[in-house]
């Protein structure tokens, strides 16, 4: 193992990452937990790492079709040939940030819709984000992704905190 330069900005617990064009590593999201002196913080932006020269470069914040910023904490990412990096699921930035700073009473008792997990599939390619689709079946946190023959498979994940599914769904990306 060899330690490389740290990602600039706040510490990032649970970021997502995937390889980018040009042999770079892309990293987005994550959060810095609260401490005795600071509230928790979300990392909305991304950064690409060039291992050849040991440098990080800022990447744009993921955004949906209407330009709203999307937090990628709890999401999953996969590199898809000729498409870019596909990002699925994740937690809602406002609900999550409030919970990690001060867990409200009854937090785990709500219906899945209350948590507003991300139901959009985003794609990062050549410096820009696009929204590929929106569907309730991808509103999951902590799912796994696989790509095969033009399809992205979304495997398992949480439908709400503490409630997991074994369901597998897929969508075309070509």
Predicted regions and their residues:
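Kelch-like beta-propeller repeat domains
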Residues: 1-174
């Amino acid at each position: 193992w060899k330690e490389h330069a740290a990602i600039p900005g706040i510490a990032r617990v649970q970021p997502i990452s995937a390889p980018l064009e040009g042999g770079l590593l892309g990293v987005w999201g994550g959060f810095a937990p609260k401490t005795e002196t600071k509230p928790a913080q979300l990392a909305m932006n991304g950064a690409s790492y060039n291992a050849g020269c040991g440098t990080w470069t800022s990447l744009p914040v993921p955004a949906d079709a209407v330009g709203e910023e999307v937090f990628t904490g709890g999401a999953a990412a996969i590199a898809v040939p000729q498409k870019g990096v596909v990002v699925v699921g994740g937690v809602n930035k406002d609900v999550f940030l409030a919970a990690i700073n001060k867990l409200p009473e009854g937090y785990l008792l709500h219906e899945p819709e209350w948590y507003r997990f991300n139901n959009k599939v985003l794609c990062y390619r050549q410096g820009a984000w696009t929204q590929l689709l929106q569907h309730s079946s991808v509103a999951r946190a902590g799912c796994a992704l696989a790509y095969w023959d033009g399809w992205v498979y979304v495997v398992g994940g949480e439908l709400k905190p503490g409630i997991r599914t074994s369901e597998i769904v897929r969508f075309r990306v070509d």
